[in-house]
Amino acid sequence: MPQLTPMTDQDAYILRDATGTTGVVDAARLAAGRLADHLIPHLIVGGLAVQEYGYPRVTIDVEIVVPDVLDALEILTADVIGPIFRVRGLEDRVRDVRTQTMIDILPAGKVLKRGCRVPFPLPTVVSEFLQIVPLEKLISLKLDSWAGSPVRRHKDKTDVIELIQRRKLPRDLVVHAAVRQSYLETWDAIQAET
């Protein structure tokens, strides 16, 4: 059985350096540290989590799941001299002005948008270190997001395909029931082409 824990691979470091996106990790670490200072647990989802699981693809923002979005926003933007500020017109997004990285704050227990069926998991660990969402939950969130907007969110499906291949994920990976069939179809299609 493959290891299902994050494994930042050398390719992710090289990619971040070559594309000038190391600031994404810096912004995520700053946010995690501020949240930890106020005993708020977090989980990293999205492209940064995908990188941490071994698929080095470009991402320019950070997605953080927290138990209470309003509390997290207040903590992250409490320092009036920054470097994290709210983004006008986007209630759940902040920007680290040092790196120009956008940080989306996502609600645990809720879904991404209407039509989605997989809720964001509840973070339980308070830490200044990045807490990466478990792989099977990341796969579930990615497939759910893709199913709701298959054209606009096509990268989510690609992330799943790449993670299945790179991590040699099993067909019986325990994903959310709402996306189980989609996972099986994707896994089977990959096997049919190899």
Go through the PLM ranges and name each one:
Residues 1-194:
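Compositionally biased terminal segments of proteins
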